[in-house]
Amino acid sequence: MSHHNTAFHQLLQPISRHEFESLAKQHHKGQKLRSASRWDQFIGLSMSQLSCRQSLRDIESNLLSQQNKLYHLGAKPIARSTLARLNEQQPYELYQAMFYKLLSRCTTDVTKHKFRFKNPLYSLDASAIDLSLKIFPWAKCHQTKASVKLHVGLNNASLIPEFVALSDGKESDLIQGRQFQFPKGSIVA
């Protein structure tokens, strides 16, 4: 079977399969997995996130249609019942540990951008994430709308977000920005 590097394969290159598998063993809970691995779950969830899939059935059909690409990523299609069971029973700490491992790698590998500022420069931004009012009644921000805000403090020298917070949709960007602990003398834009 001929192999072609896909954009998704290139996106996954910073994630070492060996590191992922060792973290998966550390964060495993319950019986041994028979029909699917945590790598299959990760690939399936990543592909579904990037292709805006909205249901388990949609994820399953997308993965089945991409079998040849999954093969080259070392994964196989995963049934919706298996994916639901893995999402429910296996702890999320695997992905949290993988995130922090990638973040530490990114902070050491990144080249510093030169600025004329003597002090560190940070960009503060917030994005509203719309939610369904029926499913998330706790996130009500208007009579017919529910949302949360994702606040990010980006270090412009390393281009890595150093501060992240989630708040209700009504909260001002400045209120959350004042709660971030920026280094003394920083310039915040």
Residues of each region from the PLM?
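Conserved, well-structured functional cores that handle cations and Mg-NTP chemistry
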Residues: 1-189
